[in-house]
């Protein structure tokens, strides 16, 4: 089945990561998955939540949001509504879990890294782009802490990234854009570490159930895409640091 954007079934959209995008943040990137664009920042806060006071470890938490005109029709700001949607809370918890999976909180010391992911243009895959970009922002925030001799050891244990896969008209597809995501039979978000450990697999049969064999095919396809993302993360971090 040809994809309307001329990609092959197992081909990612063009991915770009621009570091140091926000001047004031200890770590920041603009990440682009095709036409999806997300600003990710990592801010160092010299305190921990009350439940961790005196525990000798740090914390990482995340917030996620979409600009009103990041979509085809203007959305009302959640701040104007007075509460966050269930979707927003689900996504920001996912981002936090994903990044904590590769972070040694004891080496971070009693401080918090606050991740903020703001979608400025949405075309599918905003949560996966947020995780992949936020990891690079986290690396820069940790780099700041080490350069300032606030911490001595690197608390980051591995890379982490995320990608979507799905089944549309019986065909598995990698890295769904909005048109594909809104019409697919199955939608899967896969979060994985650089050593190929699974952090999270979110899968839903939208219209037609999927088989165990199809799940394995989608996971293999996701792993292929994630390898590309890990390579890009490494190159981005190395290039800007040299």
UniProtKB/Swiss-Prot annotation:
It comes from Nitrosomonas eutropha (strain DSM 101675 / C91 / Nm57). Phosphate binds at residues 87, 125-127. Belongs to the RNase PH family. Phosphorolytic 3'-5' exoribonuclease that plays an important role in tRNA 3'-end maturation. Removes nucleotide residues following the 3'-CCA terminus of tRNAs; can also add nucleotides to the ends of RNA molecules by using nucleoside diphosphates as substrates, but this may not be physiologically important. Probably plays a role in initiation of 16S rRNA degradation (leading to ribosome degradation) during starvation. It comes from the Bacteria. It catalyses: tRNA(n+1) + phosphate = tRNA(n) + a ribonucleoside 5'-diphosphate. Coiled coil: none annotated. The gene is rph. Its EC number is 2.7.7.56. PROSITE patterns: RIBONUCLEASE_PH. Homohexameric ring arranged as a trimer of dimers. Keywords: Nucleotidyltransferase, RNA-binding, rRNA processing, Transferase, tRNA processing, tRNA-binding. CDD domains: RNase_PH_bact. GO terms for biological process: rRNA catabolic process; rRNA processing; tRNA processing. SUPFAM superfamilies: Ribonuclease PH domain 2-like (SSF55666), Ribosomal protein S5 domain 2-like (SSF54211). NCBIfam families: RNasePH. This is Ribonuclease PH. GO terms for molecular function: 3'-5'-RNA exonuclease activity; tRNA binding; tRNA nucleotidyltransferase activity.
């Amino acid at each position: 089945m040809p994809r309307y954007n001329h990609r092959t079934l197992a081909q990612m959209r063009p991915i770009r990561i621009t570091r140091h995008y926000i001047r004031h943040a200890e770590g920041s990137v603009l990440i682009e998955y095709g036409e999806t664009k997300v600003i990710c920042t990592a801010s160092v806060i010299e305190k921990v939540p009350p439940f961790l006071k005196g525990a000798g470890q740090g914390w990482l938490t995340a917030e996620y949001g979409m600009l009103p005109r990041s979509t085809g029709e203007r959305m009302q700001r959640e701040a104007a509504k007075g509460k966050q949607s269930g979707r927003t809370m689900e996504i920001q918890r996912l981002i936090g879990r994903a990044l904590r999976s590769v972070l040694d909180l004891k080496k971070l010391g009693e401080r918090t890294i606050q991740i903020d992911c703001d979608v400025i243009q949405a075309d599918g895959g905003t949560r996966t782009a947020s995780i992949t970009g936020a990891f690079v922002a986290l690396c820069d925030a940790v780099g700041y802490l080490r350069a300032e001799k606030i911490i001595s050891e690197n608390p980051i244990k591995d890379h982490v990234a995320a990608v979507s896969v799905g089944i549309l008209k019986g065909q598995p597809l990698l890295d769904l854009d909005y048109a594909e995501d809104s019409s697919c039979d199955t939608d899967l978000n896969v979060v994985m570490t650089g050593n190929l450990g699974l952090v999270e697999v979110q899968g839903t049969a939208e219209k037609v159930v999927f088989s165990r064999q199809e799940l394995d095919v989608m996971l293999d396809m996701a792993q292929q895409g994630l390898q590309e993302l890990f390579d890009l993360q490494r190159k981005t971090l190395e290039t800007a640091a040299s």
